[in-house]
Amino acid sequence: MTEQKLTELLRDMSLEEKVNQMSQVTGGFFNGEIVVTGPMADKGFTEDNVNLAGSVIGSMGAETLKSIQKNYMEKHPHHIPLLFMLDVINGYKTVFPIPLAQGASFEPELSEQCASVAAKEASVSGLHVTFAPMTDLVRDARWGRVMESTGEDPYLNSLFCTAMVRGFQGNSLKDNYAIAACVKHFAGYGAPTAGRDYNTVELSEHTFREFYLPSYQAGIDAGAALVMTSFNTVNGIPATGNKKLMRDILREQMKFDGVLISDWAAIEEIIYHGYCADREEAAARAVDAGVDIDMMTGIYSENLCQMVRDGKIREELIDEACLRILRLKNKLGLFENPYKDADQKKEQEYILCEEHRKLAREAAKKSFVLLKNEEHILPLEQQKKIAFIGPYVDNRNLFGAWSFIADAKDVMTLHEAVQEQYVSENSTFCQGSPMLGADVCLEGFGEQQQQSYTKEQEEHMLQEAVQAAKEADIVVLAIGEDRLQSGEATSNANIRIPEVQEALLDRIAEVNQNIVVVLFSGRPLDIREINKKAKAILQVWLPGTEGARAIADTLFGKYNPSGKLPMSFPYCVGQVPVHYNEYSTGRPHVEGKDKDRFRSKYLDIPNEPLYPFGYGLSYTTFEVSDIHLDRTWMDTSGQIEAEVTVKNTGNCTGTETLQLYIHDIAASVVRPVRELKDFKKVTLRPGEEKKVVFTITEQQLLFLTENGIYESEAGEFEIFIGKDSSTDNKASFVLKK
């Protein structure tokens, strides 16, 4: 449909029809099958405005959605199709590693492939829009939704956001198997005070623009069709009613011209923030800020028409919002084919097909981070007597909290994966402990997880595990967070594994010191005790449908881990939020070298995290040479090539990710101690070496000045090239102007 036809359609629509295009309801209003992702309350919907609603959240399945679409369009005066939306975060039925784990791959193109597969499965099930990617910058591991981000670095986040948008949307939204991406949560949702979900966000203008906005901008530049508002206040004003944030910054400065949708009930919640007195005022604030779709409150549908008639808001605001929604439907080709890709036969053909599972296995392997490997205890030797112990040994729930479409029956356990590929009569398998303590109950999206073991059963599990550990050469301890301990509304002040699992670790360590920990989590954890007791730690996150096979491949050396941390693992929760790209202080502290008390440091713990951003080991070892610069100065139109030689000094083929960091030594605005500017992956055979060249241009030296624009300044810069953000391999050059 042409723009002229869309404008004519808009002109023919009644005010009620336009307003209700701006309302979103669940499929439960149509067929009783519903998945909820927010607090349920009296939403104020009537049968009339539901029958005119513009979009549906929380329903899926080709047959179901085609039926809803058909019945809806028959009743609609202008036969305008519905949009079907769902949180397809890291996969549909084929689940990939959580986004934080995908960030550990340092391979955005792999995430693009994963998003493309997720879009294919979702689209044949009738969906048009996913509420992904979440590109919020995260620094606080107490916040449960760090699992949905790709980490603490704005450059890395931007690359992954771009890749995921491209993967979901393809070359055109009208293409087969393309769905519209929604960048979220705008803005600053990843910086809640005290790491408590939905909490206040206080960010300086400089920090907000330089660290938090770039990844949103990357998604917009990649063509994301939607942006979602965040629940939180930003410097005292709720984002969903923040006209400066949504109109001045998002639409005017960042050039976003797509659909802006609220998060679940977020328009209503600006009343609870104390920003509005009632639902009518909330509707006025949100529509004035440019929020096009009200997700699940009924505030728009029950208030806007009368407010227009009373002259309290301009109808032009309704028209511009409705037109953006119609444009999105048109871009998806729904006016020509309202069912788009929905197809039951293709659901059976594509969902969980072998090709998709193969990609899920590859993505899982590349997300694993080897944190520790003393005495080269990994990879495992099959002839050894190995005891696999822990609540994750026979657990099929290897996907993140948002994977409510996935089915655990489609997932292989670690026990099954080991027996399938590396069967050995010397291996034993036992649970050892419950996942959680007996008094812990977790509620997820329509599901609960509560332990039902008696004290006697727990003691029996523990004794069985201790005996198995005594008789084993090596213990593989599969432990970590439950999948429902991370995600939305899962803030934790204690970011350690559950106490019952810590007790299991303690008892096993008493009888066998050859412990390999396979660590599952949706966030960085405080793993000091694990680090003391384990000889090896393999961080596997929440790895998805093919996670168990990927873990088995890695443990037994079929795959050599190469992942790098996208988020620092704190020494303890007292450091949080901790991140590598902090500003220097006037009294900087050098760990292990500076004994002066009057420095910026803790008295009881180190300043540095236990494992820093960019860190990750391999089964082999790599040696990185000193940095060679082809010149020691450049002007704004020039470039410098920084070269290192990396050599595989170990006994097996492996992949290293070399990382380039830059530090502006003296600037008009204090710069971070280092910032990631580029990275390159290199795969080498034993003894092989390769020259790796990074090109430095003025673009990498730009920063946000006091003038509010990005500029470079003449002066000296340090560059660091190494295997993680703590590398001391450096050189320097001068920018002349």
Predicted region positions:
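Edge beta-strands of extracellular beta-sandwich domains
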Residues: 729-733
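Glycoside hydrolase catalytic-domain context in secreted enzymes
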Residues: 1-705, 711-725, 736-737
